[in-house]
Amino acid sequence: MEKKESLDSSLKEIVSVCKRRGFVYPGSEIYGGLSNTFDYGPYGVELLQNLKQLWWKFFVHLREDVVGLDSSILLNPKVWEASGHVSNFTDPLIDCKNCKTRIRADKFLEDQKGEGFATGLTLEKMNQVIKENNFSCPNCGQRGTFTEARDFNLMFKTSHGASAEDSLDIYLRPETAQGIFLNFKNVVSTTRRKIPFGIAQIGKSFRNEIMARQFVFRTREFEQMEMEFFCEPGTQKEWFSHWVNYCMNWLTEQVGVKKENLRIREHEKEELSFYSEGTSDIEFKYNFGWGELWGIASRTDYDLNQHQKFSGEDLKYQDQVQNKKYVPFVVEPALGVNRLFLAVVTDAYQEEKLPDGEIRTVLRFSPKIAPVKVAVFPLMKKDGLLEKSREIFADLSKLGNIEYDDSGAIGKRYRRQDEIGTPFCITVDYDTLKDDTVTVRERDSMAQERVSVTRLRNWLFERL
């Protein structure tokens, strides 16, 4: 039986509302689960779709200099040799000899000695610190039972082929970026794009994390929204600055994340990825502390040069204006969809005490990303209120995901929608049958307003 991973206490309220209201479920739950796997429920998948569509709108559709791509998860294994992932995509691993628990050494040391302590430490130095401090195992409590730290490759390996004789060892991709680099030449040829331009995609990636934890923040299966922006060498710093600012503005102005919950952190030289000349993270203040949300990296010409070398293909760009050929430099904004999901739920979550002493839990999502835009309630299930409510519901469905609910007391229906994050609730009552108006209740202020049915859709459209 696989060990259950303990839940960070700071996340319990977030996890509770996500499970209770159908945002996130434990994976394979009826079979006892599988650690660090999650399924997104009806409201979770709506929130994810809204976030992805909003990203695609502002990073592809509203830009003349970016196009889209959907590359394969399974790639020729030579791709990962060329990219450096086979030899360099590792984390330091230690084992407890007593209970067999596997631990990521650098994160363990930072838990013991403070954030940033392990930055730049070699395996030898990590081993020295662990021995000198005689740390106890966080699982069994025994001291002095750790193995020597060693590199652990994070890529999932599988077989490609129907029989052992002709099967090929391949990997599930650990990032979506390489599929973009492989198609750089195809995109230039078929779209006639001129540098500077970007290629964006949304897709699943897989990393065999040693310590997958903190709910959906660090999972072995995750989704990325990545873009590789190709530019002329010497202009990458200007574009790097552009994308850091563009990404930050998108989070605050479009998604609605509070500015005080975001910060930009520049990587130290010792913590840079093997392909990067400079990286800045947009970090979010999660319940467990600051964590990477969005990484913007200057990947130079590393990837295209490596694929030229290993494949034999000429991946240089022919600049017709300057009449010269060069390998473009690349700036990469890479955003984890699951981390963004956790960030917006955390940012929106609030508990407030009402005048009657009741505690109200509410998710204050921006209307742009709210999984349900409007909920329609008949006050009673009789006297024509159901029919009128259904008529209004059908008319409003053109605005997006609209929910209909005729079960339970109105107050409880309001509370349920508060926890889902629905911006507006509409109650159809007996006055509706008299004067064709409804009560519209706003989520954050709980203020109520009578609005005529004839102008209801436009009234909501202006606010969603």
Curated annotation (Swiss-Prot):
Q: Which keywords does this chain's UniProt record carry?
A: Aminoacyl-tRNA synthetase, ATP-binding, Cytoplasm, Ligase, Nucleotide-binding, Protein biosynthesis
Its annotated compartments are: Cytoplasm
The keyword Zinc-finger appears for this protein: no
A GO biological process held by the record: glycyl-tRNA aminoacylation
Q: Where does ATP bind?
A: 207-209, 217-222, 292-293, 336-339
EC number(s) on file: 6.1.1.14
Q: Does the entry feature the keyword Nucleotide-binding, yes or no?
A: yes
Pfam families from the xrefs?
HGTP_anticodon (PF03129), tRNA-synt_2b (PF00587)
> What catalytic activity is recorded?
tRNA(Gly) + glycine + ATP = glycyl-tRNA(Gly) + AMP + diphosphate
Q: What SUPFAM superfamilies does the annotation carry?
A: Class II aaRS ABD-related, Class II aaRS and biotin synthetases
Q: Which GO terms describe its cellular component?
A: cytoplasm
Family indicated by similarity = Belongs to the class-II aminoacyl-tRNA synthetase family.
Its annotated function is as follows: Catalyzes the attachment of glycine to tRNA(Gly).
HAMAP family registered for this protein in UniProt: Gly_tRNA_synth_B
Q: Which NCBIfam families match?
A: glyS_dimeric (TIGR00389), PRK04173.1 (NF003211)
Q: How does it assemble?
A: Homodimer.
This chain belongs to the protein called Glycine--tRNA ligase
What is the species listed in this Swiss-Prot or TrEMBL entry? Leptospira borgpetersenii serovar Hardjo-bovis (strain JB197)
